[in-house]
Swiss-Prot record:
PROSITE patterns: TUBULIN (PS00227), TUBULIN_B_AUTOREG (PS00228). It comes from Pleurotus sajor-caju. Dimer of alpha and beta chains. A typical microtubule is a hollow water-filled tube with an outer diameter of 25 nm and an inner diameter of 15 nM. Alpha-beta heterodimers associate head-to-tail to form protofilaments running lengthwise along the microtubule wall with the beta-tubulin subunit facing the microtubule plus end conferring a structural polarity. Microtubules usually have 13 protofilaments but different protofilament numbers can be found in some organisms and specialized cells. Its main location: cytoplasm. This is Tubulin beta chain. InterPro entries: Beta-tubulin_BS, Beta_tubulin, Tub_FtsZ_C, Tubulin, Tubulin/FtsZ-like_C, Tubulin/FtsZ_2-layer-sand-dom, Tubulin/FtsZ_GTPase_sf, Tubulin_C. Belongs to the tubulin family. Its cofactor is Mg(2+). The keyword Protein biosynthesis does not apply. Keywords: Cytoplasm, Cytoskeleton, GTP-binding, Magnesium, Metal-binding, Microtubule, Nucleotide-binding.
Amino acid sequence: MREIVHLQTGQCRNQIGAKFWEVVSDEHGIEPDGLYKGNNDLQLERISVYYNEVGANKYVPRAVLVDLEPGTMDSVRSGPLGSLFRPDNFVFGQSGGGNNWAKGHYTEGAELVDAVLDVVRKEAEGTDCLQGFQITHSLGGGTGAGMGTLLISKIREEYPDRMMCTYSVVPSPKVSDTVVEPYNATLSVHQLVENSDETFCIDNEALYDICFRTLKLTTPTYGDLNHLISIVMSGITTCLRFPGQLNSDLRKLAVNMVPFPRLHFFMPGVCPLTARGSQQYRAVTVPELTQQMFDAKNMMAASDPRHGRYLTVAAVFRGKVSMKEVEEQMQNVQNKNSAYFVEWIPNNVLTAQCDIPPRGCKMAVTFLGNSTAIQELFKRVNDQFAAMFKRKAFLHWYTQEGMDEMEFTEAESNMQDLVAEYQQYQDATADEEEGEYEEEPAEEEQ
């Protein structure tokens, strides 16, 4: 089967990762002690994508948990799923990344990276046909951003032909826990542009908005935010884990979603949105789902898709839905809002379907959009970066770990290039491109 090895680096990611395993284990009927207690054969049919079977009916996640300090690991271990993970797969340092990208990427993280790669190798060797890796990390911290990107580039070296998929939590202005987030995020994006195949940008600010507006939670906790992220993660991979009429995998997703190699930053969304622990109170229909799915309020990245155009879109429907109805509705959305889809990629909406709905729903959909509006998110980080970098504020923390100012300048210009590329394709039309191509051969003749 097409296995995926999951890595989680840094504090907040380990909490998200733990939540993700909670959701996936629940869907596959696996108890916190790793024993299968489900009642449906479909749960076991492709369980090997995320789990190793170690004994009769006992399953262990293919997860590697990494942090530069032992604190988070202890909380995962003592949490509800503590005994689910393989003890050898916890890799941690003692010093902490201190929210410093340079520590994670060059000094502390570099010392730990070989130990992590050994565990990753062991997991990869235990697979029949490895499909790729997924990494959860935040771009604002030291471990998740610095060490996360270091791991990505090392794994890339060793497994160049495997998919590399990242769930990256982008820092947001309203929900910030450190001053140097813009530095860490810019340095990380610089790495992700080169080394990742698909990056799902998740934004704390957007998640808070969803909790306030849609779920009507007055005081959302990180638990609520992590719950939303884990739903997206489980939604993206359902096609791999369960049978369906139109299956998709990470590579098919990338082929359909990435028109230009650098532009692989997606906005995820999910509907219907329900709070943790609450059931759905009414049935949803396919037209409602498609309507909600494209709603800006459902996006988990804080940029408004109406400010840009969609290059490509993928929608993964779950539950017993009629594919004919889905196709009609998707076509309908495209026809009505054709201005928001680039016309030079016809049929740029991919739909996949999986028969098994998430717990407590009849049907649901996970949305992925490759929209040029995501540049807003990078612009925002870049402006904050520029303001601090102009005065060289906080720079000594990075230079004393051996970094050079040059690296900051490079990362900044790479991010600005990325924004410019998105803008270029947002403005491009089918006609003007043709005109350009027609002129070129004429010049050669002279």
